[in-house]
Amino acid sequence: MSRPRRRGRDIHGVLLLDKPQGMSSNDVLQKVKRIYNANRAGHTGALDPLATGMLPICLGEATKFSQYLLDSDKRYRVIARLGQRTDTSDADGQIVQERPVTFSAEQLASALETFRGDIEQIPSMYSALKYQGKKLYEYARQGIEVPREARPITVYELLFIRHEGNELELEVHCSKGTYIRTIIDDLGEKLGCGAHVTYLRRLTVSKYPVDRMVTLEHLQTLVAQAEQQGVPAAQLLDPLLMPMDSPASDYPVVNLPLTSSVYFKNGNPVRTTGAPLKGLVRVTEGEDDKFIGMGEIDDEGRVAPRRLVVDYPA
């Protein structure tokens, strides 16, 4: 029996999309997938509809390595409205409490300090975390509050930008799993006035260059240009993609000779020189350093395959 025909293109890489405000991460993901006519696509860490900024979208085989971006650090710029608390901790929610803003500059500085470093955070009910197989925001929309455990996070930097009237602007560099809305809500309670997010922009994810971000409008413009020029849209779109192994760029590289990579790609651990003593590694083959997957150093010092790239026929 012949294999079913694959729909769309076998295109592999990571697009750094500048997500627009007012759209869900899944909505923009589906638009990018259609624009690229890609077989597979997935994003790495959803942004709220209110938020804008860097949303890495993995296409094709790059989706196998998206988990490594979920685990990476991120940087945000956030503006909070002081004096009002909402049920979602952002401007999309309903105001549930209003209080005067009376704190001093010293009290603000002291409160901000408590959010720096290793802290614990109780996730918002309006999050995609699951409880008994159901997303928290689904419970919240039904008016049901369920128990949530505090989770360890790290805030590497919490920079004060400005405080004007009832607006507070901050920049946050944080670890995976950090909810900026929750930081703002908790900060508002610590200051005694309440607060919610009115503006949120993700500035960076991992070490991806900011100047490689593109908008949906730019992608659509390139498609129109390609049509006018009589060339395939892929000719203008594909150069925008980052390499498929870029989500795992923080991991060391182990290069295998072609004689060893054959065994590795067949699921077998192989011995090689220059490998670290333990941990995950990016594995390449041959003199051109072609990426073939992720490996892990086993107890015998061999490189064992963990996620492999599939070579699709052209």
From Swiss-Prot:
Belongs to the pseudouridine synthase TruB family. Type 1 subfamily. The keyword Transport does not apply. GO terms for molecular function: RNA binding; tRNA pseudouridine(55) synthase activity. It catalyses: uridine(55) in tRNA = pseudouridine(55) in tRNA. InterPro entries: PsdUridine_synth_cat_dom_sf (IPR020103), PsdUridine_synth_N (IPR002501), PUA-like_sf (IPR015947), PUA_sf (IPR036974), tRNA_psdUridine_synth_TruB (IPR014780), tRNA_sdUridine_synth_fam1_C (IPR015240), TruB_C (IPR032819). The active site is at D48 (nucleophile). It comes from the Bacteria. It comes from Salmonella paratyphi B (strain ATCC BAA-1250 / SPB7). One of its GO terms (biological process) is tRNA pseudouridine synthesis. PANTHER family: PSEUDOURIDYLATE SYNTHASE TRUB1, TRNA-PSEUDOURIDINE SYNTHASE. The keyword Lyase does not apply. NCBIfam families: TruB (TIGR00431). Its EC number is 5.4.99.25. It is an enzyme of class 5 (isomerase). CDD domains: PseudoU_synth_EcTruB, PUA_TruB_bacterial. Keywords: Isomerase, tRNA processing. Responsible for synthesis of pseudouridine from uracil-55 in the psi GC loop of transfer RNAs. This is tRNA pseudouridine synthase B. Substrate binds at H43, Y76, Y179, L200. Coiled coil: none annotated.
